[in-house]
Amino acid sequence: MSFGKTQQQDVKLQIRWLIRRDMVEVLKIESASFEYTWSEEDFLRCLRQRNCIGMVAEQDHEIVGFMIYELHKSKLRILNFAVATEARRRGVGRQMICRLIDKLSQQRRKEIVL
């Protein structure tokens, strides 16, 4: 799968599961990205559900993006997704989407929806 070219070369990231201590940085990215934001309680309520998963992208031990998605029987649904303003146009979002695509299965989940 190919995505549009970025203005700069992709940054090197570590993409991992979101953990509770990430919330301060995630909330900063959320508030800088959206007019109507999720609260910390919104994030936590969602992540407490068995089918809801969070991931973060880190560059040099700093969180530069996050994604919250739900697992459904035949698809993955992205609920919330943002990249820090200073990290945009560097392939962060594309790398996170590619990681999500890797989680698709030919037998079960075959699509990603927003």
Task: Describe the role of every protein-language-model region.
Residues 3, 8-10, 17-88, 94-107:
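Acetyl-CoA-dependent GNAT
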Residues 78, 112-114:
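Conserved hydrophobic beta-strand within the GNAT/NAT acetyltransferase core sheet
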